[in-house]
Amino acid sequence: MHKTISVELNDASINSAVKELQRYAKWVSQKEAELVTRLAQIGATVASIQFSRAIYNGSNDVSVRVDQTGSVAVIYAEGSSVAFIEFGSGAKYGYGHPDAGKHGFGPGTWSDGPEGKGHWDNEKGWWFGSGQHSYGNPPAMAMWKAVQEMTEQITRIAREVFGT
């Protein structure tokens, strides 16, 4: 939004301009928080949907929430299966997440003990829990897709919020 403030060189005009700038700063701050809220809602919705649709043999205990303070929002994915679902697992399905390596995740990177890593690449899959068999699962990329969607939507939403 383009804003023009005219000022004359006298006390009353300068005081008026200061008040106008303070109102404008408050408006920008409110709009910034609104933009962040809308983007976070989109991101959380996409992540929730992707996690809920994930192919995963274990217990999908993922929940997604947003914490927002002013113009900062953080989208959290919580649960013991988050990394397995987000990044995938196993030699058959565990590849394909574009950011797995950046975060130290991917096939063969997790173990629940010294013997755990020995089975991730078994072509026959592996057994876990109480007799459950798995070949792994493909990466759902729920958080990654949330970022992609927010990136795609930011210009449109900013124009709506700021009225430009």
Predicted regions mapped to residue ranges:
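Short, Lys/Arg-rich flexible segments
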Residues: 1-82, 95, 99-164
